[in-house]
């Protein structure tokens, strides 16, 4: 299993670079930080066309995180820590791999 992490510094500004990376390296899971977009403007369709599902905790400015995966994401949550400033900085999901559960924290 290939798991990649990338501080993209704006998913919408870098979507072509991200798609190129996915096509070249085909990671099973890509965890992105600083996506800098709310959920409503996140490019879900770009990832769906590449057969990846998304779990997104979006926010403008320097925040926002996402996990994209070839495998079904289960037990997702974005409230691991109660952040009084409501900043989108951490998400959790699990995937099944070879009869095991892999816990992802991004």
Model-derived features: positions:
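Structured beta-strand-rich core segments of catalytic domains in phosphoester-bond hydrolases
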Residues: 35-38, 42-106
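N-terminal, active-site-proximal structural segment of metallo-dependent hydrolase catalytic domains
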Residues: 1-53, 62-65
